[in-house]
Amino acid sequence: MAQDSNNLIWIDMEMTGLNPNTDCIIEIALVVTDAQLNTVAEAPVLVISQPDSVLNGMDKWNQSTHGKSGLIDKVKASTLSEAEAEARMLAFLAPYVPADISPMCGNSICQDRRFLARCMPQLEAYFHYRNLDVSTLKELAKRWKPEVAQGFNKQGKHEALADIYDSIEELKHYRQHLFNI
């Protein structure tokens, strides 16, 4: 497949917490869509190894959520470093989207960007500086058209790949019901 500068890169990560200065990435997924939000390619979901000291430092919410999903066990079994995960994701993206073209797409994407800037700076730099943050549309819909905001229910699995597809479907919902496109 040839690179397409209209393609969009969607990202979601699961982390050990919300502080990008002290918490760590434990799962990362990427999906490339075309401009009409059709899936072009899906990267393998990567689970990143973290030491027990990092996992034991998670708050109750993260321990419960990532424990129930099985992610903690996957992290313990993983041998993949952040650097290796970053290299694999960059290799995945290269055939589909030129560097510095696609905005970073997802929900509350600024948080992902903050973690990438510290933990995977080359991957963060692959994105354009702009963001396509679906949560912005959610906040506007809540205020301007509450019925549109209430008309979409996310699965909320807190699994990176499932959350990306939730975000894509949510953007399709707003495209149809907020923008009438």
Curated annotation (Swiss-Prot):
The active site is at Y129. SMART domains: EXOIII (SM00479). One of its GO terms (molecular function) is 3'-5'-RNA exonuclease activity. Keywords: Cytoplasm, Exonuclease, Hydrolase, Nuclease. Residues 8-171 form the Exonuclease domain. 3'-to-5' exoribonuclease specific for small oligoribonucleotides. This is Oligoribonuclease. It comes from Nitrosomonas eutropha (strain DSM 101675 / C91 / Nm57).
